[in-house]
């Protein structure tokens, strides 16, 4: 099973980071109001970054790393992917 760390851009230009086994399905869930509370309040969202990782634990670690980054770094990550 594949695991992914992803980042979406919210309607308020903020970035939300999470992990999933299916990034496309997860973005649809966010946009349908079945995602995280933050994205329900600041949707719709657009997928801007996806990174495949080894397993669930690696996904959690990478998610935490990305969440610690500043907004400018997240903007650069989104622009490159």
Tell me the role of every PLM-derived stretch.
Residues 1-74, 79-81:
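GIY-YIG nuclease catalytic motif and its immediate N-terminal context
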